[in-house]
Amino acid sequence: MPGSEDLRKGKDQMHSHRKRTMFTKKQLEDLNILFNENPYPNPSLQKEMASKIDIHPTVLQVWFKNHRAKLKKAKCKHIHQKQETPQPPIPEGGVSTSVGLRNADTLPRLPNAAHPIGLVYTGHRVPSFQLILYPNLKVPANDFIGHRIVHFGCCRDPNIYCLYPILESQVCAPSFHSGSPACSSNQSRER
């Protein structure tokens, strides 16, 4: 039937599949360099970059979109794997978990603008650690004893936290300050 052959050609033209783009090693290197410089290039920059590495601007746009999604997926998978790591069991006769504020006289010397908010987690006989939030301290001013914790993209928390070893004898009356921002796994998954 001559009519059915024409119908089939029209159907093929409507649903033609685009062939997969194969990038050369040099193009991939260039794309990764460009992505590291700017993961969200504007349309004029996309055209310029595409002409430099000899690909169509739409192909470049799709590669950037896919690469951002790939990195986001890998980041979420990494965070999810960290959350699934088993916690060490509390030794027999261990001290029950308590949360409280650290004595102010045991804090390291701080800049005048910093007011620490600390939580103590003691669940073992060995020394535990205290996480202290410095809400007004954006850039470390002094060398503190302990470890600085700065968030890099896992949440929108611009604060700096310091982790200090603490002994149970330094724990005050139990209290909890819920006003300190924290990076939750829900926030990480939403972004």
Curated annotation (Swiss-Prot):
Keywords: DNA-binding, Homeobox, Nucleus, Repressor, Transcription, Transcription regulation
Family matches, as Gene3D superfamilies: Homeodomain-like
Listed name of the protein: Divergent paired-related homeobox
Biased composition (Basic and acidic residues): 1-15
Xref: Pfam families: Homeodomain
Compartmental location: Nucleus
One GO CC term on file: chromatin
Ranges annotated as DNA-binding: 16-75
GO MF terms, alphabetically ordered: DNA-binding transcription factor activity, RNA polymerase II-specific; RNA polymerase II cis-regulatory region sequence-specific DNA binding; sequence-specific double-stranded DNA binding
GO biological process: regulation of transcription by RNA polymerase II
Chain's gene name: DPRX
UniProt region (Disordered), positions on chain: 1-20
Role noted for this protein: Transcription factor that acts as a repressor.
Family to which the UniProt record says this protein belongs: Belongs to the paired homeobox family.
